[in-house]
């Protein structure tokens, strides 16, 4: 959820995320300690996933380094308004069509308009050197006389101006006759709704700048497929485009970006730091058009910079082989949005869920409404997959990736780059064809990918000590949420547990130009992976999948997965065994101890959003876990 929220904020202009209450933790002997309750995210050294959070922080650092470069390439300058205090505090409904069409804008004050900006070669020029093609009064209908004079000056110089006909000046010192005359000169006496020439420029008697941008034939900075959000930055050496897949499932997006000059596109991955050429794209005048495959909620940077253009795909299409198994259809029997931890009442949301579940969804008031304001809620689902009937609970503010209500790894065929040359990744048997940038056509088929190696049974699990779980190794015959185990100390465990297992890889599973992928399926919440004793990385978001090609060998192998969940379950378990009154601080906390003397309580915090009746959250390595092969084939 932190990544999802941060990504969206970045696309709306934020470029520095600060952990603002990291230092506000006076309780060093107890966990989780003081919390922000419903007012923010609890992130400090007492957080269960603090060490694994490095992967998320690295992601923030890489992304914000790029997002802080240069400036947003705005084409429109908008007057922020004449009111005092200023009513123009945020982007309005009039602005969003411009943003959604792929353009950007900046605001200016009336003082900026009069004292700072200049007109040169049909452009508005800011002191910073930024040039704008369109000026907008937005919804301001009471500009001052001086503002109108500045607007007339821009029109005479050839600027396109957008704005509704003023109804009068807000200033008693303005001359009414001069004001009315200037309004008629700009908007005309007939009050027409059509654009009109004024001087060398054009007046658009409307709030939105979209028609003016279109008439001026200004290409969008970036045009994106549905359910993708974007923002762009430009600096002297590069153009930077940040793209977010807001879908809860894999998505292949079609994009068009403004590309002045002959710079070539690259993919910069903020999760890994990897930089590679964009595999599929085509230059079309002053734009570059491309397709790109995204994982659920994945974000990527496309960076245009100087460099020799390499051979790449211009056209690419793929067909999965016959026999590709799709997830079974889901029959939703019952769906209630209800108070967390209760079984009665709730809002019936079955019809809403049936419309959104195939692509995944976020459990929120935005989707379901708010039947219980200021209360913690949950979504209860009763459903059928085939003949199997199942129940599931998803908590408010959780994102849910729904493929048969079990996470299934993507099975795609997509373009990539191998050793600097165009290639294709086959995660499933099938065929691909298309055309390269040198005009060569290609057609490729893969038919003999080995079946995945299933690893969802017979794991050894060891829970962290002194947090209430049984000590020593515990056999998990099958992977389940900790909340489904009979042991109280596991059902209500919070912290880290290490899963261990050995497995065999057949000789023919590994070959040249074949990737070996470890897919963990559903994980709550983070996973630190080792294969054959070597670090494979930290997995902290869907899909919980990692490339282990260089870590495995034919024959016997081992895998270790350290999974960390949230504090919620242990807090509920402690409330069952040793309930506290609101505001009560136990003696052992005041004495500086880390837990109750009788081990009846392992946690303490002053914020409380649960009771002894609350249900614990799904936790641990839930799976299904499997090792898959993917063939990488060059487009020769």
What are these regions (language model features)?
Residues 1-329, 404-496, 504-511, 626-635:
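Carbohydrate-binding surfaces of carbohydrate-active enzymes
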Residues 291-294, 372, 425, 548-552:
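Short, flexible loop/turn segments at beta-strand junctions in immunoglobulin-like
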Residues 310-325, 440-457, 565-623:
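Glycine/proline-rich low-complexity spacer/linker segments in large multi-domain proteins
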Residues 344-357, 504, 546-556, 567, ...:
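Short, surface-exposed tryptophan/glycine-enriched loops
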Residues 376, 427-431, 554-556:
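Extracellular Ig-like/FN3 beta-sandwich strand-entry sites
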Residues 386, 437-438, 530-537:
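Short strand-turn-strand beta-turns centered on an Asx-Gly dipeptide
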Residues 503-505, 509-532, 540, 552, ...:
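Aromatic-lined ligand-binding clefts that engage carbohydrates, nucleic acids, or primary amines
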């Amino acid at each position: 959820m932190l990544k999802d929220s941060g990504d969206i904020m970045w696309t709306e202009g934020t470029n520095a995320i600060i952990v603002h209450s990291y230092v506000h933790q006076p309780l060093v002997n107890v966990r989780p300690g003081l919390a922000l309750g419903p007012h923010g995210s609890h992130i400090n050294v007492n957080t269960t996933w603090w060490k694994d959070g490095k992967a998320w922080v690295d992601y923030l650092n890489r992304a914000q380094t790029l997002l802080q470069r240069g400036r947003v390439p705005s084409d429109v300058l908008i007057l922020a308004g004449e009111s005092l205090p200023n009513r123009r505090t945020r982007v309005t409904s009039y602005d969003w069509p411009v943003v959604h069409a792929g353009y950007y804008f900046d605001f200016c004050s009336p003082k900026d308009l009069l004292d700072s900006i200049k007109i040169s070669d049909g452009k508005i020029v800011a002191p910073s050197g930024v040039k704008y093609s369109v000026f907008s009064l937005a919804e301001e209908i009471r500009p001052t006389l001086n503002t109108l004079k500045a607007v007339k000056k821009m029109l005479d110089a050839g600027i396109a101006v957008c704005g509704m006909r003023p109804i009068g000046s807000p200033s008693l010192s303005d001359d009414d006759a001069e004001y009315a005359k200037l309004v008629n000169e700009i908007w005309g006496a007939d009050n027409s709704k059509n654009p009109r020439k004024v001087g060398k420029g054009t007046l658009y008697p409307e709030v939105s700048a979209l028609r003016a941008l279109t008439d001026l034939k200004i290409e969008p900075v970036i045009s994106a497929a549905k359910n993708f959000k974007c923002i762009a930055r430009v600096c002297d050496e590069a153009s930077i485009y940040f793209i977010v897949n807001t879908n809860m499932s894999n998505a292949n997006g079609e994009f068009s970006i403004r590309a002045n000059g002959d710079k070539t596109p690259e993919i910069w991955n903020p999760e890994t730091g990897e930089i590679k050429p964009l595999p599929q794209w085509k230059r079309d005048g002053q734009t570059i058009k491309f397709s790109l495959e995204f994982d659920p909620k994945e974000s990527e940077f496309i960076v245009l910079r100087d460099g020799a253009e390499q051979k790449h795909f211009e056209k690419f299409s793929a067909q999965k082989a016959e026999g590709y198994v799709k997830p079974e259809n889901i029959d939703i029997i019952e769906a209630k949005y209800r108070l967390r931890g209760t079984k009665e009442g709730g809002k019936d949301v079955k019809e809403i869920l049936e419309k959104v579940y195939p692509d995944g969804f976020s459990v929120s008031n935005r989707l379901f409404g708010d039947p219980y304001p200021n209360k913690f809620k949950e979504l209860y689902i009763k459903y059928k997959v085939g003949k199997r009937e199942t129940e599931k609970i998803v908590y408010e503010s959780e994102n849910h990736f729904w493929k048969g209500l079990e996470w299934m790894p993507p099975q795609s065929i997509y373009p990539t780059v191998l050793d600097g040359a165009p290639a294709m990744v086959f995660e499933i048997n099938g065929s691909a064809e298309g055309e390269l940038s040198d005009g060569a056509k290609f057609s490729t088929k893969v038919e003999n990918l080995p079946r995945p190696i299933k690893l969802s049974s017979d794991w050894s699990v060891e829970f962290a000590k002194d947090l209430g779980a049984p000590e020593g190794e515990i056999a998990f015959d099958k992977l389940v949420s900790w909340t489904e185990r009979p042991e109280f100390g596991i059902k209500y465990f919070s912290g880290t547990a290490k899963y261990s297992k050995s497995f065999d890889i057949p000789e023919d599973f590994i070959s040249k130009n074949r990737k070996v992928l470890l897919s963990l399926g559903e994980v709550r919440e983070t996973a630190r992976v080792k294969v054959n004793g070597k670090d494979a990385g930290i997995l902290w978001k869907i899909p919980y999948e990692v490339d282990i090609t260089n870590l495995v060998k034919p024959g016997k192998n081992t895998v270790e997965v350290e999974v960390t969940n949230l504090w919620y379950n242990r807090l509920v378990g402690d409330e069952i065994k040793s309930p506290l009154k609101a505001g009560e601080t136990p003696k052992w906390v005041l004495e500086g101890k880390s837990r109750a003397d009788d081990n009846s309580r392992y946690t303490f915090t002053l914020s409380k959003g649960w009771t002894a009746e609350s249900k614990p959250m799904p936790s641990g390595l839930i799976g299904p876990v499997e090792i898959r092969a993917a063939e990488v084939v060059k487009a020769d």
